[in-house]
Amino acid sequence: MATIRDVAKMANVSTATVSRILNADKTYKVTNETRERVWQAVKTLNYVRNQVKESVNKVDIKNSTVSKVKIGCILCVTREKYTDPYFMSILSGVEAKLIENGYSLSVIRTINELQDPTILFNTLSESLTGLIVMETLSDEIYSQLKDKVEFIVGIDTKHQDIDNVCYDQFAAAEKAVQHLIDKGHRRIGFIGGTDGIDPIRKEQRYRGYLSVLEDNNIKEDFDIVKNCEWDSKMCYSKTIEILNVQDRPTAIFAASDLMAMIAVNAIYEQGLKVPDDIAVIGLSNIDMSKYSNPPLSTIDVPKTQMGEIAAEILITLIKGERSLPKKIILPTSLVVRNST
């Protein structure tokens, strides 16, 4: 196994320099070139701290050494990690099921945080037994985590080699758009985001939206399709763009409730009314959606249940009770309120 000396030798620096860079010592002045050489050496040598780590094997688990098990979770959020109601509902399900079985979450990270090499290095050095990943990671980060963490369960991920718990995003979008068409709308805008890997045209919620349009002989118009990258400010500005097109849509499908509520706010600020001028439907049925003005029509996603099932699968894997990956798809349902 690689040591800090090996890293220093490959990067052509001292072990003290390596240590300070790994610890993000801001008082230590070092060039970006040196910093990059050190991180490249860390990656090449697959170096982590605490190489002599406490082993937690299946026998230990069966002998009730639950306290030795370290479980982590990675959230796909662009804001502060504890402010996104969708992911917090999933996380509450994860934590409840872990606590019920005597476990707890030791590490919670966001995808954005893992872009920082120091945070990624520290996470890889945590000696995690299991990990729950919410949505798809980049190939590079995912491969590094897979190399260090034996048991990984995904929630709404595209990683095919691990267990996945999800809802059918395509079908959920179809339900939302079909509801708008049933209400008489023919010109329907789309506000969504991507995983940062695939373009919007490959995103399942967009494909579900487009499928219903095609089934109803409605032509796709990319002028009223906006990729907001799950960013609230961008969502607001993109909604304004939709409202300013010459042939303004009579309805908008937003791929999350938060984006739908931002769209409603933008519509009001343009002097228009919901749903009289423009109907809006979201997706996820977060708690606050019923209290928006007007209450938001949406697609209910079993968020807490997804978290509970993912945690239950992870516990089963840690205990060595099964090995082949499986995919569990949970049902969604239309919730009609006053925004449509």
Question: What are the residue ranges of the model-derived segments?
Answer:
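N-terminal helix-turn-helix DNA-binding module of bacterial transcription factors
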Residues: 1-62
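Short acidic/polar active-site loop segments enriched in Thr and Asp
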Residues: 14, 48, 69, 129, ...
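Alpha-helical recognition/docking segments in bacterial nutrient-uptake
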Residues: 61-178, 182, 242-244
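Hinge/beta->alpha junction and helix N-cap segments in small-molecule ligand-binding domains
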Residues: 77-89, 107-115, 165-175, 191-238, ...
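Periplasmic-binding protein-like
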Residues: 125-134, 189-192, 225, 246-259, ...
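Short acidic capping loops at alpha-helix termini that bridge into adjacent secondary structure
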Residues: 186-187, 220-223, 274-277
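Flexible loop/turn connectors
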Residues: 238-340
